[in-house]
Amino acid sequence: MAKAGANAREIVYPQISVTGLGDYDRNSGYTQGTVDFTWKSTEYNYDRGAKLSVDVMDNQETYNLAFGMAGAELMRTKVAPEADAFTFATLAGIAGISKGEAKTISTAEAFLAELLEAKNTMDNDEVPEEGRILYATSNLLNALVMMDSYKSKEILAAFTVKKPVPQGRFYTSIDLLDGKSAGEEAGHYRKGTAKYEKTKDVAPVSGKTYYTEDGGVYTPVDGSSASSGSMSSYYEMVTAEAKEINFMIIHKPAIIKHDKHIVSNIIPADSNPDADADIIKYRKYGLVDVYKNKVAGIYLSHKA
């Protein structure tokens, strides 16, 4: 259960915890327990949209196919993939979720072993088995299906839903392109790139890695060889480049996924004041997050 927060950009949801059982005394009776009920807040973190125009003559000359196909193509190749990629990347970045060892999984046997490890972790964390969804790359999931063994069938049966995910939607972080800046005019998203900030160190720290920047290219410099007179030009990596995800297990009740506003409409050419063109508009405003007391409901395995 969630409700509007103190401002329009957030929602709040209840979180409750109780103390456990104590010894019962035949004279004084029950041990007094406590109930802690609090409201937690989370802000909307996704606000994206696009406007496509198709000239009336272009549409006519394609037998009225161009306009309809443009809308369908937007949803199939841009909206749906970005929504998936944003969801997985956001969940992968949540602090406190369970993670396997970073490695490349190349065989069905290795995948089976990693899934058993993930299942053990979630079982020991007392995550309910019902409602667990397995998302994995198509290669891994299909390899496990083709394995067709007792063990592979048993592990797959442990998940309520099994869904293959294209690798292009399966990263630990993504960059949402703004559609305006140089190099981002096409919009959409890309695999998350490393992020850098100017160092705050006033002197080199031995063993620490700094970076110099030239035309957007960052070159590492070991702290032992960094120049104290050049500290103002050094950067530090604050976010590493995204990793490819092997698989993710999501206990559905653990996540908050809410689309507050979705609009998809058409403005005909005769209502367009700027051009003789039909317009398709699409906007989505929502959030993806995890309940603070249910982070164990997310298990992540990614490549090194």
Language-model features: locations:
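Extended, solvent-exposed, turn-rich assembly/linker loops in the middle of proteins
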Residues: 96-165
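Short, glycine/acidic-enriched capping/hinge loops at junctions between secondary-structure elements
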Residues: 22-28, 293
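Glycine-centered small-residue hotspots that permit tight backbone geometry or close packing
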Residues: 26-28, 126, 170-176
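Active-site-surrounding "flap" and adjacent substrate/cofactor-binding loops of secreted or lumenal enzymes
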Residues: 28-31, 35-36
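Short, hydrophobic/aromatic alpha-helical segments in well-folded domains
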Residues: 74, 114-121, 283, 296
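Sequence/fold signature of self-assembling virion shell proteins
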Residues: 4-19, 40-45, 62, 106, ...
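Long, contiguous amphipathic alpha-helices that act as assembly "spine/axial" helices in icosahedral shell
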Residues: 13, 37-100, 123-138, 265-290
